[in-house]
Amino acid sequence: MTLSAQQLQQHTPMMQQFLTIKSEVPDTLLFYRMGDFYELFFDDARKASQLLGISLTQRGKTGGNAIPMAGVPYHSVEGYLAKLIAMGESIAICEQIGDPATSKGPVERKLVRIITPGTVTDEALLNDRQDNLLCSVYQLQNSFGIASLDLGSGRFIINQFQHTETLQAELQRLNPAELLYPENFEHMDLIEHLQTIRRRPEWEFELATSKKILNQQFSTKDLIGFGVEKAEVALCAAGALLQYIKDTQRTSLPHLQSIQLEKNIDSVILDAATRKNLELTQNLSGGFDNTLAEVLDFTVTPMGSRLLKRWIHQPIRNFNTLTYRQTMIQTLIEQDLSSALADPLKQIGDVERVIARLALRSARPRDLTRLRTAFSLLPELQHLIADLPTELVGKLNKEMGLYPELLTLLEKAVIDNPPVIIRDGGVIKEGYNEELDQWRNLAKGATDYLEQLETRERQATGISTLKVGYNRVHGYYIETSRSQSDIVPAHYIRRQTLKNTERYIIAELKEHEDKVLSSRGKALALEKKLYEQLIDLLLPHLQNLQSTAQALAELDVLNNLAERAVTLNYVRPTLQAENGIEIEEGRHPVVEQVSKTPFIANPVMLNDKRRMLIITGPNMGGKSTYMRQVALMVLMAHIGSFIPAQQAKIGPVDRIFTRIGASDDLASGRSTFMVEMTETANILHNATKNSLVLMDEIGRGTSTFDGLSLAWACAEQLAKKIQAYTLFATHYFELTKLPENIPELVNVHLDAVEHGDAIAFLHAVQEGAANKSYGLQVAALAGVPKEVVSNAKNILRQLELGSQPQANLNEKPLQTTLAFDDAQTNQALLLLANINPDELTPKKALELIYLLKERA
């Protein structure tokens, strides 16, 4: 909303001020502080009224039309802000910074910050157990760069890659609360599903501009020291992100002290389909129930919970780091320290985000008490882990640190239970500052004086009901009933008339009022100044405090994984350099927790001689569960966790792929089969011999022969060319012949027992192929009408009889043509129809076979 000077003159001074500030943030809801309310005007008011369900009123007129207005009380604003942020809205906060008592004209106001979904740091507006990331994406030719910033911790990370599939996977992993993109971005289909995306001018992504703003932030000459200088596309994204942060926060960002380049080679790569199908932190319905994180996350600090979820979404390949985590978990179990460590960690809470608010100068009084609590508990934590081997806890102890001087400072400066905000004072402890104590004592002395004045005036006037009081609107007053107003002394000056009472002021009381209000104002101003100075004293320790928060979060995660290992009967997997995945009595970490019946543990053995398991068995027999549990155990091993098994040896794994289940992608116009084939293509293009691949029912979305052909060819490609560790579940029993031609393939099956029309699933993995799929029995269990099931049985018998002549599908399984074409089939059938088998001699029968062979 941009108005000319002439147009502004048509408004009141207050509205002129509003419109001038609003012109700075035309596309953002402006919360304009007026006394005890935040007001919104014009279109902002209409929008807020609709989104928040608050009343839409009017204030004055402009151009002959009433000005729409809506407002919320300042003391409950956070609840409204949280709702708007959850809807993806951005809010600009305009505060009164002038003193109404001394202001001539409108009180001075200033735009202090802009809150967007990706830049929130306020405790009340955040999910404390989930990262809140601002991301930026940029494309240059065939390369993509992505930058992510967690403003609540200062983690600033970039990555650069070349495929849209990787971009899709990264966006799903990061799950940004807000994403920035350049005006000419070509792949809108990959980002438009996100709730909050913001188009930014192309020039903000220029490399020179980006390097300049990044060097300014880190006070460096170049970025070589961070090891990011070659990731130029990612740096473009990072520069635009940092510019956006500076535009919205309008303050320095001292906790942004470095930038880190992530490399895919350091991680076990998970594509978007794999993250979704394995239900790591979100189930298929979008909730948290029955996910891996729900089972593993019993952390006691919010920052620990966030770190664990990052580990789950980004398993690592660094053997030394994984061994350290495993050994630390093992030691915590052996020393029985889990419960002892959990209690102080729980009291420490979320110091990571407290430190970020400290850096942004938005820390509240209770944030300082949380820091004080953390400082007081650090010695206890270090004492608890003092007996652990130095090679395990030496680095942790160093990063955790001790802060006796800061603890003493906060103990002297801040009262035990301060108010939520500093606005009304009452935060700084008595004895911390002599001048503050003097002003406070002067203000406190008012109570004694008022009691003495009331007693004296009652005696002087003879009015026994006379009272001396105070309110924020009218100040101090002497109150009498209206019936006694005719006997008040002449020097009483009427200040306010109420229904049954009269209120007066006298010169002595007015003098006292001026003195008290002056002392209160001076005390409050001094207290706010001391509070800012307190933050200034803490800021030089910012980098060390960030290291402390990271160390505490890691200790919480490792301690949590130790507790989970004991409680859930997990074992330490052996991570080996040799190829292979061998797990004895493995269990699905989630299903075993929610199942009402005992979970059936199963083994898996994959090595150079067993590269692929062809898995057959009944519907509902547990094939998908078995496959997922293998992937989840491998993933858990690569975050350093113990796993649900009796014993395990796991070799190098670079990627995990899953092709399990599919549904129509209506938004992109893709059918179930197209989704299935897209995921399959991704696997066939990107899997390596160290990848773990889960393929479930490939080819089921098309005709039988097409599906069988595709499944056959995919299995052959994975086994012979790619040689990935593969679990290949199928209902095409023809595929069970593949191991006869490819020795690295092995048949396994999940069995079931039939009794009459009933079926019992054993859920146990056995060597060899299954003999049937029990589809009709499962249909009956699902409640399909009996007459339909009965009819299906009859049809099945007919099909089985009719399919006998085509049982040669597996004779030449690796050839392109698996059966006669239509013309050849008709000729063969005609030839056979004209033959009487009883009249054939052995020689004629042999000649007939050769003839059919020639026409095949």
From Swiss-Prot:
The lineage's top-level taxon is: Bacteria
List, in alphabetical order, the Gene Ontology terms for molecular function in this entry. ATP binding; ATP-dependent DNA damage sensor activity; damaged DNA binding; mismatched DNA binding
Its keywords, alphabetically, are:
ATP-binding, DNA damage, DNA repair, DNA-binding, Nucleotide-binding
GO terms for biological process, alphabetical: mismatch repair
Keyword DNA damage listed: yes
Q: Which CDD domains does the UniProt record give?
A: ABC_MutS1
One Pfam family here: MutS_V
A GO cellular component term found in this entry reads: cytosol
Q: Where is the signal peptide?
A: none
For this protein, the record's PROSITE patterns field holds:
DNA_MISMATCH_REPAIR_2 (PS00486)
Residues reported to bind ATP? 617-624
Per the entry, what this protein does is: This protein is involved in the repair of mismatches in DNA. It is possible that it carries out the mismatch recognition step. This protein has a weak ATPase activity.
The record's family statement is: Belongs to the DNA mismatch repair MutS family.
| NCBIfam families hit by this protein | mutS1, PRK05399.1
- What this protein is called in its record is DNA mismatch repair protein MutS
Q: What is the lineage of its organism?
A: Bacteria, Pseudomonadati, Pseudomonadota, Gammaproteobacteria, Alteromonadales
